[in-house]
Amino acid sequence: MSDTKGAAEQGLQIDGDLINSNWNEVVDNFDDMKLKGELLRGIYAYGFERPSAIQQRAIMPIVTGRDCIAQAQSGTGKTATFSVSILQRIDTTVKKTQALVLAPTRELAQQIQKVVIALGDYLNVDCHACVGGTAVREDIARLNEGPHIVVGTPGRVFDMINRGALKTEAVMMFCLDEADEMLSTGFKESIYEIFQLLPGETQVVLLSATMAPEVLDVTKKFMRDPIRILVKKDELTLEGIRQFYINVEKEEWKLETLCDLYETVTITQAVIFCSTRRKVDWLTQQLHDRQFTVSAMHGDMKQEEREVIMKEFRSGSSRVLITTDLLARGIDVQQVSLVINYDLPSSKENYIHRIGRGGRFGRKGVAINFVSNEDKNMLEEIETYYNTQVEEMPLNVADLI
């Protein structure tokens, strides 16, 4: 893989033809995957009818115990891919932690926990979310009960292993979700330390939207002959998402543009992304002053506060959420029909994580980008990177949402 790494170190998005998929077997329905009956019931009760492309390819090899690297965009069913595989592999009669899943944010870890519990509803599965912002004593007590599956953020998980609360001797599966995000946000050391503390034969499953150099390093150091299921760059589509831009010229005109849009469009649910926490607070205040109902969420807020806001947003009692990139990957709300990039993301990779929120699993969505004169270059870069066309917003945008 050395030439791949060279390309990666030059800061290039790695082309699909440099690291080819080495697994092409497709199983296109859940009934043919030889899954436990209770797990199948959970899958259908959750609302899945047939597996997504990544599920059709990855579940079977993961269930057989192979190490696996899966590259797929946000919103393609990655969480269910490893959740189903873990639930199939673990033995729920054994009261020990058998699978460990890491995620970059608390919100994503809690989201994964919810999916695991829902899919494992008929299996009596015990799944614990081990995240910062919660009482250490409670965490230790829960981990001493030996939950079958632990989902957590790297810092807290490492701490719990060190304290002897999270016992790893029975761990047979280690899964890294959104690996690119975790490794780029300073968790690398904790993740490497955790690897050293797991049994040598632990199966490793890694999921990532992009194959950054840090991700490739992990695959080389810790994975044995992995199956690679890779979506080529030009296949990282934004399928089903209608993308538009509004030319606002000046930064200070964005607010009025947003207010106009708010009045034209009936929004079921929308997420508005800003570049900084301060901007989130400012915009929320501006909209409140104009009698618009919106909620806001960012990393400076207390954990309990963030949970209340997410609950309101999920239940639909709050319809518009203003947030930052940090939380883009933890928002999984089925009804999100509109994403507004008040500020374009500072990195091209984050674009897919933001607008992948709308239209998940084939549901249609609309993304509207506010573009000032300074943003034009970034928009062009995004179009080139994703091989996509962002059109000027039509007057009848209300009919499309």
UniProtKB/Swiss-Prot annotation:
<dbReference type="InterPro" id="IPR001650">
    <property type="entry name" value="Helicase_C-like"/>
</dbReference>
<feature type="domain" description="Helicase ATP-binding">
    <location>
        <begin position="59"/>
        <end position="229"/>
    </location>
</feature>
<dbReference type="InterPro" id="IPR027417">
    <property type="entry name" value="P-loop_NTPase"/>
</dbReference>
<comment type="similarity">
    <text>Belongs to the DEAD box helicase family. eIF4A subfamily.</text>
</comment>
<dbReference type="Pfam" id="PF00271">
    <property type="entry name" value="Helicase_C"/>
</dbReference>
<protein>
    <recommendedName>
        <fullName>ATP-dependent RNA helicase eIF4A</fullName>
        <ecNumber>3.6.4.13</ecNumber>
    </recommendedName>
</protein>
<dbReference type="GO" id="GO:0003743">
    <property type="term" value="F:translation initiation factor activity"/>
</dbReference>
<keyword id="KW-0694">RNA-binding</keyword>
<dbReference type="GO" id="GO:0003723">
    <property type="term" value="F:RNA binding"/>
</dbReference>
<dbReference type="GO" id="GO:0010494">
    <property type="term" value="C:cytoplasmic stress granule"/>
</dbReference>
<keyword id="KW-0396">Initiation factor</keyword>
<dbReference type="InterPro" id="IPR044728">
    <property type="entry name" value="EIF4A_DEADc"/>
</dbReference>
<dbReference type="GO" id="GO:0016887">
    <property type="term" value="F:ATP hydrolysis activity"/>
</dbReference>
<keyword id="KW-0648">Protein biosynthesis</keyword>
<keyword id="KW-0347">Helicase</keyword>
<keyword id="KW-0378">Hydrolase</keyword>
<dbReference type="Pfam" id="PF00270">
    <property type="entry name" value="DEAD"/>
</dbReference>
<feature type="short sequence motif" description="DEAD box">
    <location>
        <begin position="177"/>
        <end position="180"/>
    </location>
</feature>
<dbReference type="InterPro" id="IPR014014">
    <property type="entry name" value="RNA_helicase_DEAD_Q_motif"/>
</dbReference>
<dbReference type="GO" id="GO:0003724">
    <property type="term" value="F:RNA helicase activity"/>
</dbReference>
<feature type="binding site">
    <location>
        <begin position="72"/>
        <end position="79"/>
    </location>
    <ligand>
        <name>ATP</name>
    </ligand>
</feature>
<keyword id="KW-0963">Cytoplasm</keyword>
<feature type="short sequence motif" description="Q motif">
    <location>
        <begin position="28"/>
        <end position="56"/>
    </location>
</feature>
<keyword id="KW-0547">Nucleotide-binding</keyword>
<dbReference type="GO" id="GO:0002183">
    <property type="term" value="P:cytoplasmic translational initiation"/>
</dbReference>
<dbReference type="InterPro" id="IPR011545">
    <property type="entry name" value="DEAD/DEAH_box_helicase_dom"/>
</dbReference>
<keyword id="KW-0067">ATP-binding</keyword>
<comment type="subunit">
    <text>Component of the eIF4F complex, which composition varies with external and internal environmental conditions. It is composed of at least eIF4A, eIF4E and eIF4G.</text>
</comment>
<comment type="function">
    <text>ATP-dependent RNA helicase which is a subunit of the eIF4F complex involved in cap recognition and is required for mRNA binding to ribosome. In the current model of translation initiation, eIF4A unwinds RNA secondary structures in the 5'-UTR of mRNAs which is necessary to allow efficient binding of the small ribosomal subunit, and subsequent scanning for the initiator codon.</text>
</comment>
<dbReference type="GO" id="GO:0005524">
    <property type="term" value="F:ATP binding"/>
</dbReference>
<dbReference type="InterPro" id="IPR014001">
    <property type="entry name" value="Helicase_ATP-bd"/>
</dbReference>
<feature type="domain" description="Helicase C-terminal">
    <location>
        <begin position="240"/>
        <end position="401"/>
    </location>
</feature>
